[in-house]
Amino acid sequence: GDVYKRQTVMFEDKEEKGREEIIDYALKLSRAGLNVNSSGNLSVRFDSPEGKGFLITPTGLPYDETEPEDLVRILFTDNGCYKAVGSRQPSSEWNLHAFLYQARPDINAVVHTHSPYATMLSCLDEAIPPFHYMVAAVGGDTLPCAPYATFGSVALAEGCRDTLGKDRLGCLLSHHGSVAAGRNLKQAYAVALEIESLARMWMNLKQIGGCPLIDKEEMARVKEQFKTYGQQEKGHEEG
């Protein structure tokens, strides 16, 4: 089984920064209305001398009561299992985060929320269609819904991993909520906000019978456009 052990509250600077960043974004999620109390969870990929793995929020602890030392480190082991290191138990959804990190080297942060509109739409068990070009910002021409499975289960983690595939950064989780990922927490948080915004708009449109959709060819062009979005600004910053 998982091994838990007490760890000191002193961390290397890089790890301390990562722990503080997770708490900062957890509080941002709460302020934005995307999570309530201890619902949802966040993680950041983190490799240490002890091994490769990630830092994740603990289970059952409200974000405004969470301290950096409360976060749990999950280590990937050589035999394909996982080892949890910390004074608390990790989020019940740690499997979901682990499966995404191991399947997608491009993902360095994961945010899981129970935001209101995304959660309502997830209960319809259907994808958000390409009603707006920003659907492509999450990586596809639709925003899919992963099949239902019990929270915290391997089946849920597998379903989420398979639904995201090779390039999507987010999806709904049937009768549950949503998952957002990114190259860092800033991007994962932005994706979580975008999913909730799209869900809110689509929910309102469904009340009046929906709307015309953008075709696959145009969504493909939008996806290509997003690949270079912001690169010019980045070039100016580096120049």
Predicted feature descriptions by range:
Residues 1-4:
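Short, small-residue-biased leader/transition segments that mark boundaries at the very start
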Residues 6-239:
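Glycine-rich flexible loops
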